[in-house]
Amino acid sequence: DWPEDAQIRRLSDEFGQPATLGNWRRIWRDEYWPADQLEQLDIGATRPGWLSMVPHTSSWYQDYRGELSYTVIAGDFVASTRVETYNRAGSGPPGSLAGGPPDSEYSLAGVLVRAPRADVVCCDPSWWQPGGERYVFLSFGSASQTGAWQIETKSTRAAIPPETHSVSALEVGPASAGPVELRVARIGPYLILLVRESGQAWRVQRRMNRPDLPGTLQVGLTVYTDWAIAGTWPYAEHNASVITSAWQSPGTSADPDLLAQFDYLRFVRPQVPPPLVGANLADPGAVSDAQLLAFLAPGP
């Protein structure tokens, strides 16, 4: 490793030691929210050698802020994980215990890259205003098709007046049962999202040009579930609550249905080939998928 790469590799976690759980920052604590949106979080207790997360009803969309266990990274990086997602019983895809109509589930887990909020003030969430979210994620679980495995990518930008909330653009695609490997590369303003399903080759899932993202980002793991109920809540109240029912409707119970397990989270510095330095990596006409995969996912 060259020195900078060795430094970033030290942030990685193979989830072999329960004590390393304390190395990961939690967004709800750092931004002074009163509610932990995880019902369960452990390394090794649920499954040896894996980090397990079971979320309460929650979401990342527009100004809904969900779970993020993260570290802070300056400059370019490649973040990689291997993840499995199930319903809470571990017997099938997320959302399959109770089912639901299309677009009601959105129970997924993956890698999230986020701009730190510059407006955070100690020591309660009264600082918060809508419209300030900037993030990208790549996740695996059940999205628009309840009870089926899918891949979701999302790019959220801050509001531009007269907009009153952050704006999210998402894409959903099919996937097979896990484990699935997810990889997010940040190279200058570009975010390259890669996926490898079990027994298959790496593929480029999505490319983004995000010059609005700062040089230092929050990078980590996220989980979210039960959009049908989470989406009934106002943004601030969602972000500050452990949700057990629909907004102002206690008779309509929440139905969170996700168990996510991560094998590792690894960080390296990307080594961009000289001919591609300065190229528009978000443009397939300028840089092909094969060229990206050659340096972001080399080998078998």
Predicted segments, located by residue:
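Extracellular glycan-recognition regions
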Residues: D1-P300
